[in-house]
From Swiss-Prot:
An annotated Gene Ontology molecular function: calcium ion binding
Keyword Glycosyltransferase applies: no
Residue numbers carrying Blocked amino end (Pro): P2
Record-given protein name: Myosin light chain 1, cardiac muscle
Gene3D superfamilies associated with the record: EF-hand
Residues covered by the EF-hand domain: 48-85, 127-162, 162-194
Organism: Gallus gallus
Chain residue ranges for the region called Disordered: 1-39
Length: 194
């Protein structure tokens, strides 16, 4: 047997670097909500308007000596009595996000309330007829201008500014047809007329 020829030495293969994992996508920074500062709001109401607001505010004053103060819990009610329609989240924001237990104990005077009213009145984003119809069209599975009453009831009770069962019943009274469907264009007209 002939002697084995030594095998030529192979050049060592360069070490393959492990591929680096793809960098994590930058997480979007959570939007920092600007704290509401009543002192930064310029009150632009006329003296007559302010007098009218003061009168309405005083109707909610339950202090023993009529000190022109209301509880935090009453703030949304006063805003609504003055023609505004803020969400509960908006009311909580202008109040500085108080704890639930502070709502009935903390008080606010008229001078502090006025900038809050100004802010709410300037930022209100009232939906138009078209906005509401477009929003309900999402639930129109047949494309025939109607939505299922049961589905609309569920949405009104569980999404956004949730309504109570009684509020939903009042809102939908006489709106459903024999099949339990609601013509949503007529429904929006009905809501906006009230």
């Amino acid at each position: 047997m002939p002697p084995k020829k030594p095998e030529p030495k192979k050049a060592p293969e360069p070490k393959k670097e492990e591929p680096k994992p793809a960098p994590k996508p930058a997480e979007p920074e959570p939007k920092k909500e600007v704290e509401f500062n009543p002192a930064s709001i310029k009150v632009e109401f006329t003296p007559d308007q302010i007098e009218e607001f003061k009168e309405a505010f005083s109707l909610f004053d339950r202090t023993p000596k009529s000190e022109m103060k209301i509880t935090y819990a009453q703030c949304g009610d006063v805003l609504r009595a003055l023609g505004q329609n803020p969400t509960q989240a908006e009311v909580m924001k202008v109040l500085g996000r108080p704890k639930q237990e502070e709502m009935n104990s903390k008080m606010i005077d008229f001078e502090t309330f006025l900038p809050m009213l100004q802010h709410i009145s300037k930022t209100k984003d009232t939906g138009t007829y078209e906005d509401f119809v477009e929003g309900l069209r999402v639930f129109d599975k047949e494309g025939n201008g109607t939505v299922m009453g049961a589905e609309l009831r569920h949405v009104l009770r569980t999404l956004g500014e949730r309504l109570t069962e009684e509020e939903v019943d009042k809102l939908m009274a006489g709106q459903e047809d024999a099949n339990g469907c609601i013509n949503y264009e007529a429904f929006v007209k009905h809501i906006m007329a009230n």
